[in-house]
Each structure stands twice: as structure tokens, then as C-alpha cells.
Swiss-Prot record:
Belongs to the cytochrome c oxidase bacterial subunit CtaF family. The keyword Hydrolase does not apply. This is Cytochrome c oxidase polypeptide 4. It is a multi-pass membrane protein. GO terms for molecular function: cytochrome-c oxidase activity.
Length: 143
């Protein structure tokens, strides 16, 4: 078993213990010390979080058995072993900031339920995504 699945299994055990403590704590104790019913939102969240970390741990465990030794699990690995090939990055591009503004505009439209603002935000987001992807030009046709 490798480190990633061990972390998920440990988190599963922790969340299961916290779910049991939380369920019994909210079932029997109130802020005033009187008997109270189960608090369903927190109990459901903890139980589902436990199930999610267990599913993720099992998936990682099965996946790691099929792969070779990862750099994280190899004691003599260097930092460069994990890095891989980095893609092109344009530090002077304005479009990531413009795209963030468009997402903010869309978010405000959704929050305040102004349909015109949702439309403007969606159009601005579509425009900025296109400009980000095509900022270095579209190659000319070869014919």
C-alpha cells in the first residue's frame, strides 16, 4: 500500500470516529445539557464524507497497484523526477484577469438573479475564454 491510499484510509478512520462521536453527542446532549434529537445535517455530512474518503482510498489503492513506483514512494527520488514537462505560460497576458472578472460578473448575476447580468457575464466569459485560447493567433490555412 502506498502513501496516498494510506492517507485516505487514515482520514476515513478519523471521519468515522468523528461521525460516531458527533451522532452520540448531538443525540443526547443539548447546549443546556438537556436531551435533544439527532442533528441530521452534520451527521449526514460526516457519514457521506467518510464514505467518500473510503471510496477514494479504495480507488487510489487499486490504481496504485497497477502502476510503477511513483516518485513520492521512491526514497531516492529527486524533485525533478516528478516535475515532468511544463507547458507554455504567458506571464504578460491580460486574459486570465479578464476571465476572472467575467466569472465575477456571472457570479453576481446568479447571486442577485438578474438575468441580464447573467447573460452579460456568460457572454463576457465566452469572449475571454476564446481570446485566451487564441491570443497568439490562429494558424493560417495551408491552401
Amino acid at each position: 500500500m502506498k502513501s496516498s491510499s494510506k492517507i485516505m484510509y487514515g482520514l476515513t478512520v478519523f471521519l468515522a470516529a468523528m461521525a460516531v462521536i458527533y451522532i452520540f453527542g448531538t443525540m443526547y446532549v443539548d447546549d443546556r445539557g438537556s436531551v435533544m434529537g439527532l442533528e441530521w445535517v452534520g451527521a449526514t455530512a460526516l457519514v457521506l464524507s467518510t464514505a467518500l474518503t473510503l471510496m477514494l482510498g479504495v480507488y487510489i489503492h487499486i490504481t496504485e497497484r497497477r502502476t510503477d513506483v511513483l516518485p513520492e514512494d521512491w526514497e531516492e527520488a529527486e524533485v525533478a523526477d516528478k516535475a515532468g514537462t511544463l507547458g507554455f505560460f504567458s506571464p504578460g497576458s491580460i486574459w486570465p484577469a479578464a476571465m476572472s472578472g467575467a466569472v465575477g460578473l456571472l457570479g453576481f448575476g446568479i447571486i442577485f438573479m438578474h438575468y441580464w447580468l447573467i447573460l452579460v457575464g456568460a457572454l463576457a466569459l465566452t469572449y475571454t475564454i476564446a481570446k485566451l485560447n487564441f491570443q497568439y493567433g490562429v494558424p493560417r490555412e495551408k491552401h
